[in-house]
Amino acid sequence: MKVAIVHYHLQPGGVTRVIENTMRAWEQNDTGPDQCVVLTGRPYPGNTLQQVQVVEGLDYAEAKDAISSTSLKQRLEQGARDALGALPDIWHIHNHSLGKNPALTGAVAELASAGASILLQPHDFAEDGRANNFSNLSSSKERAYPTAPQIHYAALNQRDQSFLQKSLEGSLSPVHLLANAIPENQPNLACSSGGKFPDLPENLFLYPVRAVRRKNLGELALLSTAYPEFHFANSLGPTNPSFLPVYKSWIDFASRQGLQLTYGIGEQTEASFPELVGLAHSLVNVSVAEGFGLGFLEPWTFGKSLCGRNLPEITADFTELGLNLDHLYNEIYVDSSLIDKQELEQATAIALKKVYSQYGRNLPDNGIIQAYNSICTAEGVKFGYLNEDLQKSVIEKAKGSELTIAEIRKQTSLHLLNDDQIEKNKYAVKENFSLQMYGKKVFGIYQQITQANPETVQFTGCEPMLDRFLCPERLNLLRV
């Protein structure tokens, strides 16, 4: 079996790690395709992947700058021939419909029309709060999701699988659940000593993420307000220059409030990332949106506890497989008296109108009311759905209220799991997300595709998938 794996780039990051882990899994299992090449739009800076071909025009590109879909299809085919000696039996393509380069979406449609056997593995979606990406898909929107028995999809989680299945309902393309692998050879970082780095806080609760808006930095400030006995920190600042002013405003806010909180702590110490993790009492999560949810799995493999926010839409798969996340909270509700309701109403209306306009959709009747009521509920106001200004206002008011602080502590109940519980979660991750199992699943899907009886390809556009993601009740002001 010959396989061509395709992605826009192989820079360090999530998809690159998935591709590298796939290769590692096949090497360790001594199973997998006979030949495999990775086709990418940029030179590969790593050394794990042995067979890599750079394809001009595959990298990120705006619609106005992208090459034609036909040209990219031809270049992909030539790159595969050069490496494999023939066209591949399977095209395994990552994030084809994300809107990072409309030529790839179109090239996939052309490969599908030509009868190619394809595995499409979306990690993220242009329809999910990425309106600029959606717009960049341009005319390729109408053929974004090809379907036929010889074209399969692989989803990271049950939510994505369900959304794809509903969007492709009636088609002949199966949608597999393919969770990412977690390598087993992670260092145990549970017992590191802080003596080497006396400048770092001893009571560190580390949020091991780079600062982006959906990571919900304000909730870290709220937790710091409610738990002054702990020192909270995220690891890295933003790389996106447009988010830098917001990031700096949180740094200034934390300083003015006198919080035990450091944003970008990894950039203020000589400690390496593993050393930071080792020094932390616990890892913490406050993100409001994730694709796969690696941050809910990796801490246990390091021998660390995790506390903070759960994302049941993402972690339902994990808990079904034995991972215990019952100690995490699903939401922090604050009393509506802490909110300027008029400001929230205005922010909700502006955000919802903006989102629907960006996606070229008409705002549904009562949409603003539905969105507002999904944020301001009978239980209270969802803190993680507020924008930065509203979050800061809540924190300022909460700091002077013992009753509010007590309520936040009751809801969040931050504490460390004992060694036995950590070990049980570590075992659940090892058993269900191993490289060995991942490699077998991927190769098993390939075999199913090659055994399919090919039929004429049909196409589903982006609109059904957009229907799944775009609804007033899913509005989060941090994602607009």
Regions found by a protein language model. Give the residues of each.
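N-terminal strand-loop element at the rim of the active site
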Residues: L10-P12, A25-K73, A80
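Acidic anion/phosphate-binding donor-loop and adjacent secondary structure
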Residues: R130-N133, H176-N203
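Short beta-strand->alpha-helix junction loop in the catalytic core
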Residues: P43-Y44, F125-A126, R159-D160, L177-N188, ...
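A short, active-site helix/loop in glycosyltransferases that binds the activated sugar's phosphate group
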Residues: S135-V175, I182-N185
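Aromatic "clamp/platform" in nucleotide-sugar-dependent glycosyltransferases that forms part
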Residues: V288
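Conserved donor-binding/catalytic core segment of Leloir-type glycosyltransferases
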Residues: A4, K196-K215, A221-S224, A233-N234, ...
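Nucleotide-activated donor-binding/catalytic signature segment of Leloir-type glycosyltransferases, i.e.
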Residues: Y247-E275, L321-Y333, S337
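Glycosyltransferase donor-sugar binding loop
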Residues: T40-Y44, F230-S249, A254, L261-E267
